[in-house]
């Protein structure tokens, strides 16, 4: 599923640097480890930014779920994320609730994201 959003409205921040964003969501019921895989991404095309949660086996060192920032197809940061053992609809609802705070935690330097700051 892909939906276009007005970033300033979604984040409730009239000063946010871009208004164009989209949210991409996908679920693969029964991934290769017998567990559902999913991705929930915030994408800003103008700034070549992707912030997203991924439940898959691509980075096992971060656990079952990781949060990442990518910029211009380069991963900037990975963090372990909370595993939500629930119905996919509940996972999506909870991640969408977390999304504004997560996007706002992205730190920038010289027009490039450099990581998260959740302080």
PLM regions and their residue ranges:
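Negatively charged, low-complexity tracts enriched in Asp/Glu with abundant Ser/Thr
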Residues: 1-35, 116-118
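Extended aliphatic helical segments
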Residues: 2-5, 25, 30, 51, ...
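Residue-identity detector for glutamine
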Residues: 20, 55, 68, 98, ...
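An exposed acidic His-Trp-rich patch
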Residues: 36-89
